Regions:
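C-terminal cap of metal-dependent C-N hydrolases
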Residues: 375-426
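Alpha-helix-loop-beta-strand connector modules within alpha/beta enzyme cores
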Residues: 109-128, 172-185, 332-336
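Divalent metal-coordination and catalytic microenvironments
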Residues: 10, 26, 31, 56, ...
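Histidine/acidic residue-rich metal-binding segments in metalloenzymes
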Residues: 140-304
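N-terminal metal-binding scaffold of metallo-dependent hydrolase/deaminase domains
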Residues: 1-45, 421-422
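His/Asp/Glu-enriched, well-ordered alpha-helical/loop segment
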Residues: 203-230, 297-298, 303, 309-381
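Metal-associated gating/positioning segment near the N- to mid-region
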Residues: 41-42, 54-117
Length: 426
């Protein structure tokens, strides 16, 4: 028997530049969108299908993650490509863009871009091609060949190449109109700093990261954008109020992203723990967080990235200052940001989707997600569901460094239409 479900009423957000329909209706057949509104009601009536009330839930396009890391995509004890796309889809993500890694996944040549798109999965996996050979910032990779082979853009991950090499690449222009994703981060200035400098960091007793480790490279990248206005330079992971202020002063601004954790919390938070404090870029204080949210609302920052950096159990046994920085957990992003931005800060659903889906698509240069008849690219979000994420959930990420584990979360993606690899228990 063909499975049909009529959601009526349900809140519906069709796509960018659309407003939420507060009393909409949608007919689903075998996981695909069959019809909307009165057409959906009439088709359900003709088929003898009753309605399922979902007036508080939101039917919306899938989310898009601009950048995340995956050190061991095809093997390993922790997160793999299979577990990542499964958990990302459970969190409503229909597209992921993976950064090149410092390990064996540099993706410096076209043949390293193969094998990431599974035939049994509708989560689109985009790949950032390596900007420099070995990520060393000395020699350029074959940019044109990488773009032609399907790289979504170019990046050296968490490393910022030297300015002369960046200038050379932008002058050569082999990236064309594809984004060049660079973190405004001076690793030398940051040194061993773990938290952004300030009273909270001093009270915590951890090494501090000076503000200049972001503002100095940000000024350099801003100048490069002025000199190469035809290039799509993109700032990865803005993290300070000073950085937002600098962007405001520019007449020609590079695009910018921010990680969800910097929007959600700060080093001032009493809920912060050692495990969730240490991310890249360094976590700032309440002023930084407020400025980042303002930058998003004003369009200075176009995308909230997950920037997942999964660790396995063994890696998490190391002291926080001796292991790779970062957190993971695609399933936790939408519920957390809904509470922070919609419930607490008065954002609309349209605003939230612009920075979690439509803006990220535009930044990547791909078609924006949109609800359409015959498509399975949709999610159903219930903001009132209270649940506790656990690693035993077959849809959960396999990363050990998920800061929202084992604590109640409000809001959850209760259904998502896109296909993913079957769970091991299925």
């Amino acid at each position: 028997m063909t499975e049909m479900i009529l959601l009526d009423p349900v809140r519906v957000l069709v796509g960018p530049d659309q407003t939420v329909q507060e009393h909409g209706a949608a007919l689903l057949r075998e996981g695909c969108l069959e019809a909307f509104g009165d057409q959906a009601r009439e088709a359900a009536r003709a088929a003898g299908i009753g309605s399922t009330a979902a007036g508080h839930q939101l039917l919306a396009p899938c989310l898009v993650d601009v950048h995340s890391l995956l050190p061991e995509p095809f093997q390993g004890q922790g997160e793999t490509l299979e577990s990542l796309v499964r958990s990302a889809a459970a969190g409503g993500y229909g597209q992921l863009a993976l950064l090149p890694e410092a390990s064996g996944n540099r993706r410096e040549l076209p043949d390293r871009l193969r094998g990431f798109q599974r035939s049994d999965c509708d989560v689109a996996v985009h790949l950032w091609g390596g900007f420099s050979q070995g990520g060393q910032g000395e020699q350029l990779t074959p940019h044109a060949d990488l773009i032609e082979a399907g790289a979504i853009g170019l990046s050296d991950g968490n490393s910022m190449p030297p300015v002369p090499l960046l200038d050379r690449a932008l002058t050569l222009g082999e990236s064309g109109g594809s984004p060049v994703l660079i973190p405004p981060l001076d690793a030398v200035l940051r040194g061993e700093g773990l938290l952004r400098e300030g009273p909270e960091a001093l009270r915590a007793g951890w090494p501090t990261d000076p503000l200049s480790s972001e503002t100095l490279p940000l000024s350099q990248l801003a100048q490069l954008q002025q000199e190469h206005p035809e290039r799509k330079l993109t700032l990865m992971g803005l993290s300070t109020a000073a950085g937002v202020d600098l962007l405001k002063q520019l007449s020609l601004r590079p695009a910018a992203t921010v990680s969800w954790w910097h929007v959600l919390t700060s080093n001032s938070s009493s809920a912060a723990t050692a495990a969730s404090w240490f991310v890249s870029p360094s976590l700032g204080d309440r002023t930084d967080r407020a400025a980042l949210i303002e930058g998003l609302s004003e369009g200075l920052i176009q995308a909230i990235a997950v920037h997942a950096s999964p660790l396995d159990d063994e890696e998490c046994l190391l002291p926080p200052d001796q292991r790779q920085r970062g957190i993971a957990g695609h399933q936790h992003v939408l519920p957390s940001l809904w509470q922070t931005l919609v419930v607490s800060s008065g954002w609309t659903a349209e605003q939230l989707w612009d920075v979690l889906s439509f803006g990220p698509s535009r930044l990547l240069g791909v078609e924006e997600e949109r609800l359409s008849q015959g498509s399975n690219r949709w999610l159903l979000f219930d903001p009132d569901v209270i649940w506790t994420p656990t690693r035993s959930d077959p849809w959960a990420s396999q990363a050990a460094n998920q800061p929202c584990l084992d604590q109640p979360l409000s809001g959850r993606v209760v259904q998502c239409g896109i296909r993913t690899p079957a769970c091991p228990a299925d």
